[in-house]
Amino acid sequence: MSTMAKSPEANNLHQDVIAQFPILNGYTHTVGAFSQPLNVSRLFIIDEIQTAYDELRVQIPWLAHQVVVVDAGPGKSGYITTAPWPSSAPPNDVTYEEKDDAFPSLNTLIKSGGSFLATKDLVGYPGLPEPHGLHPTPVATIRLVFITGGVLVVLSTHHNIVDGIGLMQMWDYLDILMGGGAISRQDARSANADRARVLPLIAPGEPVKDYSHLIRPNPWPLPPPPKTEWRLFKMHPWALAEIRSRARDGTDQRASARPASSDDALTAFCWQRVSAMRLASGRVTGDQVSKFGRAVNGRSAMGLDSSYLFHMMLHTETRLPIEQIARSTLAELSTQLRKDLDAARTEWSVRSYATFLAGVADKTRLLYGGITNPQTDLGGTSTMHWASRRPIRLGLLGDCHLIRKPEGMPLPGCLYFMPSGGTSGVVQLLLCLPKEELDALQEDAEWKHYTESGGRRVDGPRL
């Protein structure tokens, strides 16, 4: 569905980063666990990481900036952008803490699969969607937590400015710099691109895709969300390969048809099993419609790659009756999910998204992803593809044993797909659902076959 573009809030066809949603005014934290090399002091490690971080900010200066709101006024919330770090403020250097006595050893942490990692134990401020309370507000921070046998490196970025793809790319850049290398000129140009020009808005009067569902309704039509909690599941490479094979089974194999990706397949699997669990529990009826909202990386549509660190995510929605989801094959669900994702990942769609956001004077009216009913809907984002790249490492610290998104405030109905770190190929599935739903999901035969939770081993490949 399309409409005609209206004059944007800005006086030209450009505006800053597209992630202008109030809920994104917070931090995404990632933590990597590394061994401390023999005969290498903690002070030396701090100095090495600080040196690399300083060089990264020399080559990509806006990473040293603060996050600010500009152009606010009556009826206008303004928009979020970056500005130089105030000279009167303390420098935004690497911080560190020693927690040998208060935290498990590295070996214990690895054996537990990272189950001890929580935001409140690692950094002095929360992650999304909680208010951060930082003034000034840094674009990025690095914190080191030393434990017996190793160090936890916490890399955090402000989510209005840097998305998950950009955050993962920063791990690569830190490793390159710690190893004595340099960021390529092409990557530096991309990272420093004028973000207000990368995504030109659509001229007034031209057709634009309709994104009006991103405006918060008044009055709010849903009851308060149920109490939810995060739970981590793991999927081994054989399981993901089998699910991907099932998602491609019987689908169109013409050269022009794109096969289901691992993300498509895993999204279809989670949506199907959660819907089947909810249907079996009697909490929903088969004719109720469920929405799966997916975060879409808009870089390729705009001729960009992961070296463009700024936020470039939008959303797509797939809606189906719950009984249809539960009864469909993974191939059928994956095909529909892929079709909707491809429709969202076009230049016109991404530019329409930016044009719509620029035209909303009061950004507090924006609702990230639109209305989500936690009783029926799910939403997911993924950095799973990072597992196909070289393992995450940091110079003298070597390979990352595990990488995690530390546990924070619940986001009902949210799913994260992430690599686990190291070379195992294990994928993390982080789900936020009511406890009774998580417990029921763990008893679902399909879910039990393919996933591991709480130290329980998976069944093994199906013969």
Swiss-Prot record:
Entry keyword Plastid: no
GO molecular function, one term: acyltransferase activity
Pathway(s) per entry: Mycotoxin biosynthesis
Coiled coil: none
UniProt EC number: 2.3.1.-
Superkingdom field: Eukaryota
InterPro entries hit by this protein: CAT-like_dom_sf, Tri101-like_N
Keywords: Acyltransferase, Transferase
Enzyme class, first EC level, given as a word: transferase
Other comment: Trichothecenes are sesquiterpenoid toxins that act by inhibiting protein biosynthesis.
Function: O-acetyltransferase; part of the satratoxin SC1 cluster involved in the biosynthesis of satratoxins, trichothecene mycotoxins that are associated with human food poisonings. Satratoxins are suggested to be made by products of multiple gene clusters (SC1, SC2 and SC3) that encode 21 proteins in all, including polyketide synthases, acetyltransferases, and other enzymes expected to modify the trichothecene skeleton. SC1 encodes 10 proteins, SAT1 to SAT10.
Family the entry assigns: Belongs to the trichothecene 3-O-acetyltransferase family.
Name of the featured protein: O-acetyltransferase SAT5
